[in-house]
């Protein structure tokens, strides 16, 4: 965090898997002299910063940010009220009593605020304008559903107000579930075309992420990886059971580790989905560690070289090795990759798409989209992003029977 009053202020997960704020005298900084300033809370402590003579602590609770003002002795003074479930970025320093922060959510394009430490009031000082879209017509709610082993899993659902739960609404279910990465609320312009065509956007906070600290992460890695797929399946079943949708209207999507998620989930429950979009996915779990940076993922996946037991576990869900070939009807699938992806090499998607097309999995289309002169995704020019999502939504709309010209 920083140094003040002759002390180092820092966050540690030692003895607190969701994090706690500590101090130690610079002159005597051994671990035996650490002093707990703010103990572990229900939320995950994701950041702390000085703001004048006070401190701003940001927690992630149930996958959404909460922000509090503390004094330097560890006493909570105030909560910075946010518009709804969202994600916050903090800018503050020791020499200024005014704090600046950004806020975004599923139906909130990024907005900037100033917060006065003296009055406890926020003032919006900037926003992102999106023309021809009324965000007030849409709402986000958070639900908690039960996974296969009884674990409660949070999920955000965004939809148009007044939507009827008749089991016929198109749902776009997104997940990741790995590498200690959380999925907080975020804004993406590409989702607007989905929402304005009557779609529901659902984002499940699966195990393997950091939403509830290291225990949540550990619950979705190595020989717990099936928990992630079961969490995703349970999210789909929840949306169906609660009459948000039905299998004929349900699309799933995920990228990278999320592409693995989609590929594995489709093999486990092909009956649950109408469309699947596995993007730049890790599809060969037996050999992933032999390509480029793949060896670095062993901390989450384990490798087939670790042990016979680990190899058998990986083989049990590896997407390319578990495609059914008995006439089981699979959803329409568009695999995406890029010819210069050196993170998840395109061979994963090539092998998976070839295996899909060779197998007897019904008549729904099984396509692969190969982007040229592109990589894993980061830094992609906007023109390529637009082209990719145009193809993705066209594929989804075609297979769900949605005509975007008729709203």
Segments (PLM) and residue ranges:
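Active-site-proximal cap/loop segments of hydrolase catalytic domains
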Residues: 203-407
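Peripheral, non-catalytic segments that deliver or gate enzyme domains
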Residues: 1-168, 179-197, 224, 237-241, ...
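A fold-wide structural signal in alpha/beta-hydrolase
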Residues: 171, 195-205, 367
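Conserved beta-strand elements of the Class I
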Residues: 9, 171-173, 334
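Acidic helix/loop microenvironments that form the catalytic cleft of cell-wall polysaccharide enzymes
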Residues: 177-179, 257-258
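Active-site donor-binding loop signature of nucleotide-sugar glycosyltransferases
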Residues: 39, 82, 117, 127, ...
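The conserved beta1-alpha1 loop
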Residues: 175-177, 337
């Amino acid at each position: 965090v920083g140094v003040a009053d002759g002390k180092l202020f820092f966050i540690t997960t030692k003895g607190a898997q969701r994090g706690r704020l500590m101090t130690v005298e610079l002159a005597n900084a051994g671990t035996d002299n650490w002093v707990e300033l703010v103990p572990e809370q229900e939320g995950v402590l994701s950041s702390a910063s000085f703001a004048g003579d006070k401190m701003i602590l940001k927690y992630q609770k149930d996958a959404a940010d909460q922000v509090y003002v503390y004094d330097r002795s560890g006493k909570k003074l105030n909560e910075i009220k946010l518009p709804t479930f969202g994600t916050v970025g903090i800018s503050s320093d020791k020499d200024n009593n005014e704090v600046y922060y950004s806020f975004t959510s599923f139906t909130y394009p990024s907005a900037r605020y100033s917060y006065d430490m003296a009055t406890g009031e926020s003032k919006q000082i900037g926003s992102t304008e999106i023309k021809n879209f009324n965000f007030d017509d849409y709402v986000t709610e958070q639900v908690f559903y039960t996974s296969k082993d009884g674990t409660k899993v949070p999920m955000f659902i965004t939809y148009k107000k007044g939507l009827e739960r008749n089991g016929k609404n198109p749902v776009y279910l997104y997940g990741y579930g790995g590498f200690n990465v959380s999925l907080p609320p975020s804004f993406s312009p590409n989702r607007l075309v989905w929402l304005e065509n009557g779609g529901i956007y659902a984002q499940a906070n699966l195990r393997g992420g950091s939403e509830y600290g290291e225990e949540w992460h550990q619950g979705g890695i190595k020989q717990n990886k099936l928990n992630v797929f079961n969490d995703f399946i349970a999210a789909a079943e929840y949306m169906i059971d609660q009459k948000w949708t039905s299998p004929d209207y349900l699309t799933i999507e995920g990228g990278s580790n999320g592409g693995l998620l989609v590929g594995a989930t489709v093999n486990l429950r092909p009956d649950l989905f109408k469309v699947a979009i596995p993007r730049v996915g890790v599809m060969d779990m037996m050999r992933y560690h032999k390509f480029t940076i793949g060896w670095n993922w062993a901390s989450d996946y384990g490798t087939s070289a670790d042990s016979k037991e680990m190899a058998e576990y990986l083989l049990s869900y590896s997407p390319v090795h578990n495609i059914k070939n008995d006439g089981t009807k699979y959803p329409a699938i568009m695999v995406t990759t890029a010819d210069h992806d050196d993170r998840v090499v395109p061979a994963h998607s090539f092998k998976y798409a070839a295996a899909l097309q060779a197998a007897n999995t019904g008549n729904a289309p099984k396509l692969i989209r190969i982007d040229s002169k592109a990589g894993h995704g980061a830094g992609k020019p906007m023109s390529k992003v637009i082209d990719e999502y145009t193809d993705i939504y066209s594929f989804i709309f075609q297979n769900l029977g949605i005509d975007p010209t008729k709203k």
